[in-house]
């Protein structure tokens, strides 16, 4: 009789983060159920046994069917307003249905399982900005949560549902709070709609790169493949991780002006043209306080618990992203 490998259910498998997690987990001897609204791209060199399932998880019964028999569930689904932004307004019920309601559905589905098997592990993609105004730049996860924006409030609400279910023995749940995740690798299958890749696109089009404020705001930027490795590694450490949130980051922050300048320089190497200008502009009306606070993430706790560390330096990640976009690969993504 063959070995029955664990079943990992990946929710949001065609998204920017989820597709990277799928590629990473596909290298493992596991069974994967890749769940998304549209069919997932199965890596050609996959070692895993992959089931592609299309579903609208907001439909009645869809979540229960998706997570049936799962040993581990990785929840990367997020509500994206329009085509490009995670920002949502107060009282956005459609966003709440996805960002909070799906977690509620997941927990109910697991709680209703027959039998007395071990509770499944659940890894949730949270956000470091859930903390709100911390009063300091370096965060390590011990700060009290006081989220300011609706997106962060909804993320925190979902996380609290998960951790309450962990305390009740329904799941073994952990929230991995992510900083700004960005970039492309040679096998990327989903668009990066964040600021870094947006600036790469602008530079390739010969447009100036608009910089809010004076450019001194620093960000801890995590390459998407490093973020994906964190979730794959988390599968092996559910017992150590469950019951709390964990911060992920590189431990190094970079001024956005320096990031934009480096993008302009790298694109110029491809185009043979002078680097595009980095220009200061007035922030848009939708900008909030978090857009002007520097963040550096101390992820020592997660590194110690899971043995993870980021492997791709910022400059190398930017270069991979520029190369992907300059080759026209991004334009072929759905």
Regions found by a protein language model. Name each.
Residues 187-192, 215-228, 244-266, 312, ...:
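Substrate-binding strand-loop-helix patch
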Residues 148-174, 204:
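Active-site Tyr-X1-5-Lys
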Residues 8-28:
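N-terminal Rossmann NAD(P)H-binding glycine-rich loop of SDR-like oxidoreductase domains
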Residues 7, 313-334:
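Amphipathic terminal alpha-helices
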Residues 156, 169, 181-197, 212, ...:
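Glycine/proline-rich active-site loop of Rossmann-fold NAD(P)-dependent oxidoreductases
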Residues 234-287:
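Mid/C-terminal beta-alpha module of Rossmann-like enzyme folds, strongest
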Residues 54-98:
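NAD(P)H-binding glycine-rich loop region in Rossmannoid oxidoreductase-like domains
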Residues 104-150:
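Conserved Rossmann-fold NAD(P)-dependent oxidoreductase catalytic core, especially the SDR/UDP-sugar
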